[in-house]
């Protein structure tokens, strides 16, 4: 239990570091950095997307309803039919946007990323993707984003399994709240 509290504290430290980075970038651009999370999948994906958006908003990103955002995350599913096809189709479109805006960052997560053949395809065919992570470590989004900012290369962090559940991190209730938006 103590280890999980320490991990939660560690992730908040990464959020604070990234908050400074986002603020600096926003000042350089003269506008807030924007983000968009696209969810392909089941209710678990929706819940995970709420957590991802909560972390992004905590570090200073502003959610927009378009995929032409500064940071775009695709949260994927292997259970829902056609999720793979949808993702690869969207990545084809996003590649053009990234060519126009090389500063744009693209993250892929979810259970589809747990499959080794998918990771290999992305590494070889979609080299413009910045961050790839699975279902077990979405709580590390700020840490992975920092690693990407520091390295300038693709970050891949897939955990095969874990008993680690990190709670007490921000979430933005989009799907499970009766009100249109509840971020905390």
Label every model-predicted segment:
Residues 1-146:
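Cofactor-cradling patches in redox/metallo enzymes
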Residues 147-157:
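The C-terminal output helix
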Residues 121-124, 153, 170-174:
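Short, charged low-complexity intrinsically disordered segments located at boundaries
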Residues 74, 107, 153, 164-167:
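Residue-level signal for pocket-adjacent positions within structured domains
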Residues 175-184:
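Single conserved hydrophobic/aromatic residue that forms the stacking wall/gate
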